[in-house]
Amino acid sequence: MYYLKNTNFWMFGFFFFFYFFIMGAYFPFFPIWLHEVNHISKGDTGIIFACISLFSLLFQPIFGLLSDKLGLRKHLLWVITGMLVMFAPFFIYVFGPLLQVNILLGSIVGGIYLGFIYNAGAPAIEAYIEKASRRSNFEFGRARMFGCVGWALCASIAGIMFTINNQFVFWLGSGCAVILALLLLFSKTDVPSSAKVADAVGANNSAFSLKLALELFKQPKLWLISLYVVGVSCTYDVFDQQFANFFTSFFATGEQGTRVFGYVTTMGELLNASIMFFAPLIVNRIGGKNALLLAGTIMSVRIIGSHSHTALEVVILKTLHMFEIPFLIVGCFKYITSQFEVRFSATIYLVCFCFFKQLAMIFMSVLAGKMYESIGFQGAYLVLGIIRVSFTLISVFTLSGPGPFSLLRRRESVAL
């Protein structure tokens, strides 16, 4: 009943919905758009993704520091929203034609735009709304659930629209960006509050200091969580980059594969949303560290399992996505707020969970692209899966806070 009356919960919930609706028009079908519409090779696709990662590196630490400096002011979100309105014109009239003229130039321009609005923009939005959730007393994970639903609905719609005319998908994204602007306009985060609450969310500018933020890098636990991100989260993102092309290869035609991919993505994201609703309760019970380890375990199963040979197996493995993302996202913020000062939450999130991941992806994307061409998707996925399992096991001992062994001991003591 409380959530029904919490205006900011609905405003930011629907902001997540439409933002990830736009992302759903881009991310799942981007490899297909590159390969089937623009006839880009697997190797060149790796270069494009590497450029996106490169420019994301420039924006993510800046966005992190800027987000903590701005607190709950919406300046950065306005810039991201304005660029999203240009989603369709950019893809249709700028990015696509440039890729045909010069692959490197197109990759650089695309990397700047996509790195800004998605790879750096998405975590900046998540970090902002996580701060707003603490100010407005609602669970971040439940607001983030709207994003899963938005992605799911768009994936199904875009899967159909893409096979009719791929440009329809991009115009749909630009239209949704206009709705984002309206939601941002009417959301209210600057209401009067006590200094205690403002400090808790890092809303006071005096609570933020660049010098203190840089002091974070002297803490070993920051580097250890970064090790988890590079070895676990980064490996998964590299795996997912060209998974759509691997998925469609199991079907008679590319159009059939694209449609089925859209349906499966929709089903997975709707299930993802249902898990996301309960994720805060589970993560609060098991702790941030265990949530991250659980996400790593599920992702490892999916990657290694993709060394499969039938469409049914690939469909089943695709739906595992519904479990991994809720525990990764909610778990990472739980870990950050329990192990570090909350006034630096955005900086830590965008540097550790985003910047270091993108840094590793510059090299891993190119390496994965070469593996896809030399040993095929299945062989490459087996290699990525082994890397993932190794780093998940290492993280059991390197991440701070109560781990799985502490959880087992606690259960045994309760049983006694």
Curated annotation (Swiss-Prot):
The UniProt site entry described as Substrate binding is assigned to: 126, 144
Q: State whether keyword Kinase applies.
A: no
**Regions crossing the membrane:** 14-34, 46-66, 76-96, 98-118, 145-165, 167-187, 212-232, 263-283, 291-309, 315-336, 348-368, 379-399
Q: Which UniProt keywords apply?
A: Cell inner membrane, Cell membrane, Membrane, Sugar transport, Symport, Transmembrane, Transmembrane helix, Transport
Residues on Periplasmic side: 35-45, 97, 166, 233-262, 310-314, 369-378
Gene Ontology MF terms in the entry: lactose binding; lactose:proton symporter activity
Q: How does it sit in the membrane?
A: Multi-pass membrane protein
Which residue positions does UniProt flag as site: Proton translocation? 302, 321, 324
Marked site: Substrate binding and proton translocation:
269
From the UniProt record, list the reaction(s) this protein catalyses.
lactose(in) + H(+)(in) = lactose(out) + H(+)(out)
Indicate the principal place this protein occupies in or around the cell.
Answer: membrane
Q: Which Pfam families match?
A: LacY_symp
Gene Ontology cellular-component terms for this entry are: plasma membrane
User: Which of the residues are on side Cytoplasmic?
Assistant: 1-13, 67-75, 119-144, 188-211, 284-290, 337-347, 400-416
Q: Where in the cell is it found?
A: Cell inner membrane
The task this protein performs is described as: Responsible for transport of beta-galactosides into the cell, with the concomitant import of a proton (symport system).
The family classification in the record reads:
Belongs to the major facilitator superfamily. Oligosaccharide:H(+) symporter (OHS) (TC 2.A.1.5) family.
- Cite the NCBIfam families for this sequence: 2A0105, PRK09528.1
Q: Provide the protein name.
A: Lactose permease
Look up and give the organism this protein is from. Answer: Citrobacter freundii
